């Protein structure tokens, strides 16, 4: 199950007993998932949700808190929606319900943000509002290049209200407009974990953290692999460079090169790709990494001094065209 579906399923089954919290959740769900419609001169309250569990939760809450019998309709997949959509609709006494849930104020005017009792309420009300908003239009991406928990909002006022509710929960959220839609976004991985915990999605938090850890382990392994590859490439380039310079050094020095330096240089030319440690092991008798490297350095330095005396190109001349 995708993370978004997992979170919504868990939140839709979360038992909540406090009336104020249940009302805050219902108000937010209606605000973010639906709206008001005028049908035959009557106000109809409607909410469209993407999970059956969330729709049934809303329908039950409307009956228990407000005594409203809501219709539940299922819309088959089509257009941009790959799965079923669930519409919860209250046609009878819709205006009364709209006022009770804060969709309309006392004078019957639309409320653009969240009801004042949520905005000025406690932490539990803020968490309930976020729970309703996420059930309505929330999404959670799996940790990857960027972690994102996002809620699409019906307008800037509701987005700002949701940002304020997040602040009361100790979470930094930002509001932004994307392709004409207001969205509230939480990007920090730790903040997402805190928010999910506040909403009551404890099992989902564990799954989220497991995804994060797995992603970080993979990223660390990739960094180490890239680091190792880079080291191998650097070592190989250095070995090829040394082999080319050694060949030129032996040409410059001819028979005057000391035997032990000539032996070290010959080993490097014969085995241009091996590491210094492996090269030392091939010597007779075996040499340490530092010892074989020192002999090769002295051979090249001796050849460069001799080239200066003779006025001819030194060992660097051997590198032209040798390396990419």
Swiss-Prot record:
It holds the Pfam family WhiA_N. InterPro entries: Homing_endonucl, Sporu_reg_WhiA_N_dom, Sporulation_regulator_WhiA, Sporulation_regulator_WhiA_C, WhiA_LAGLIDADG_dom. It comes from the Bacteria. The keyword Cell cycle applies. The keyword Plastid does not apply. GO terms for molecular function: DNA binding. Keywords: Cell cycle, Cell division, DNA-binding. Residues 275-308 bind DNA. Gene3D superfamilies: Homing endonucleases. One of its GO terms (biological process) is regulation of sporulation. NCBIfam families: DNA_bind_WhiA. Belongs to the WhiA family. Involved in cell division and chromosome segregation. This is Probable cell division protein WhiA. The lineage of its organism: Bacteria, Bacillati, Actinomycetota, Actinomycetes, Acidothermales. The gene is whiA.
């Amino acid at each position: 199950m995708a993370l978004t579906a997992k979170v919504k399923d868990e939140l839709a089954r979360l038992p909540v007993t406090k009336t104020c919290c249940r009302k805050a959740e219902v108000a937010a769900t209606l605000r973010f998932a639906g709206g008001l419609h005028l049908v035959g001169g009557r106000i109809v309250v409607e909410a469209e949700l993407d999970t059956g569990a969330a729709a049934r939760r809303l329908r039950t809450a409307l009956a228990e808190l407000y005594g409203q019998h809501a219709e539940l309709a299922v819309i088959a997949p089509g257009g941009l929606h790959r799965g079923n959509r669930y519409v919860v609709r209250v046609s009878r006494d819709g205006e009364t319900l709209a006022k009770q849930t804060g969709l309309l104020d006392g004078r019957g005017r639309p409320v653009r943000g969240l009801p004042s009792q949520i905005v000025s309420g406690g932490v539990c009300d803020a968490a309930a509002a976020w729970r309703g908003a996420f059930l309505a239009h929330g999404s959670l991406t799996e940790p990857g290049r960027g972690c994102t928990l996002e809620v699409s909002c019906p307008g800037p006022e509701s987005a700002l209200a949701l940002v304020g509710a997040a602040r009361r929960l100790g979470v930094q959220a930002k509001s932004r407009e994307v392709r004409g839609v207001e969205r509230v976004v939480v990007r920090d991985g730790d903040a997402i974990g805190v928010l999910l915990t506040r909403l009551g999605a404890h099992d989902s938090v564990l799954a989220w953290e497991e995804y994060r850890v797995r992603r970080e382990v993979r990223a660390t392994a990739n960094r180490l692999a890239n680091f190792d590859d880079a080291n191998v490439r650097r070592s190989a380039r250095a070995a090829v460079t040394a082999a080319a310079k050694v060949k030129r050094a032996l040409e410059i020095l001819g028979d005057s090169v000391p035997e032990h330096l000539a032996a070290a240089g010959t080993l490097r030319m014969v085995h241009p790709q091996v590491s210094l440690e492996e090269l030392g092991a091939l010597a007779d008798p075996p040499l340490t990494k530092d010892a074989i490297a020192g002999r090769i350095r002295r051979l090249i330095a001796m050849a460069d001094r001799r080239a200066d005396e003779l006025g001819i190109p030194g060992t660097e001349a051997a590198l032209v065209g040798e390396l990419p």
